[in-house]
Amino acid sequence: MSVRVPEFKVLPEPADLPEPLPEPAPADLRLETVLGALSDPLRLRIVQKLLLESEQFDHTCGWFGFDRPKSSLTHHFRALREAGVTRQRQYGLERRSHVRVADLDARFPGLLDLVAAWTPDGV
């Protein structure tokens, strides 16, 4: 049985971006840490939505439209960043996120294809 893998978007990095917030280096990405971050259905949905629905290079937590408190979303975005799944940058008072596609594909080929093909259940 084969899995149909949807195409996901990799948008070019704009010029003059702020420096990213602290994150693991590509060589320090650990599969168990990445899978731990992706084990939460909301975080998995965040990554999938970034992969499949992004219209810009990065997005604020409000773009996702989740009916969750901002503090809860902040926790989930931090967990994804600290695991190395997403990169966040501070733009004034807001943080914007995108998936570290090149880094994750290099370390764990096929992982993002599985995330993109995942069917959410009740998130």
Please give the residue ranges for each predicted region.
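Canonical helix-turn-helix DNA-binding module
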Residues: 62-85
